[in-house]
């Protein structure tokens, strides 16, 4: 895929808008009741689509537009809009989850480069997305370690910020990777 300046600008804004939309969209799975055909209930997974939108843009457009979209998103968050789970402004650097925010930049880079280094395949997109998720959690774990007062605090933070949301994120990244693969097929 040829990346021109206009391509980068367009995908940067698409990524930024997807990040904004993802913030307000919880990840829920429908549960169908065969006996009651009128009601569909939804299982709340406890996370939003922020990680998925970041990795989707990385796998579809590459590392550069995804990083620029994350930078725009961070700038808006710093200047007062509550775009992150932990709030906004410069105070968010004092939150234990700050490492995950920084990790989103590394994830954009890793997933975006990996998605384009080999021929397009679903397996390559899946590996790219999951490696990006790993980068987010690695940066997050380091940030938690730096923020923790003790080993016990770090373990409890790690459970709260990484282990509890991880199963939902694994499912969400799988579904997002399929969507990214289909988009890449259309764009190629």
Swiss-Prot record:
InterPro entries: BioY. One of its GO terms (cellular component) is cyanelle. Keywords: Cyanelle, Plastid. It comes from Cyanophora paradoxa. PANTHER family: BIOTIN TRANSPORTER BIOY. The keyword Plastid applies. This is Uncharacterized 21.2 kDa protein in psbX-ycf33 intergenic region. It is found in: Plastid, Cyanelle. It comes from the Eukaryota. One of its GO terms (molecular function) is biotin transmembrane transporter activity. Its main location: plastid.
């Amino acid at each position: 895929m040829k990346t021109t300046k206009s391509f980068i600008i367009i995908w940067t804004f698409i990524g930024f808008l997807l990040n904004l939309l993802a913030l307000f969209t919880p990840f829920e799975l429908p549960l169908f009741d065969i006996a009651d055909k009128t009601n569909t209930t939804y299982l709340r997974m406890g996370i939003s689509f922020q990680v998925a939108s970041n990795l989707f843009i990385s796998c579809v457009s590459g590392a550069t537009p995804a990083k620029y979209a994350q930078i725009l998103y961070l700038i808006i968050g710093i200047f007062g809009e509550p775009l992150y789970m932990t709030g906004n402004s410069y105070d968010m650097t004092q939150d234990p989850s700050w490492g995950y925010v920084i990790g989103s930049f590394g994830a954009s880079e890793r997933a975006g480069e990996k998605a384009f280094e080999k021929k397009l395949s679903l397996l390559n997109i899946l590996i790219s997305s999951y490696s990006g998720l790993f980068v987010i959690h690695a940066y997050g774990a380091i940030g938690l370690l730096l923020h923790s007062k003790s080993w016990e605090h770090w373990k409890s933070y790690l459970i709260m910020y990484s282990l509890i949301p991880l199963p939902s994120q694994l499912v969400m990244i799988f579904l997002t990777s399929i969507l990214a693969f289909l988009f890449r097929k259309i764009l190629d």
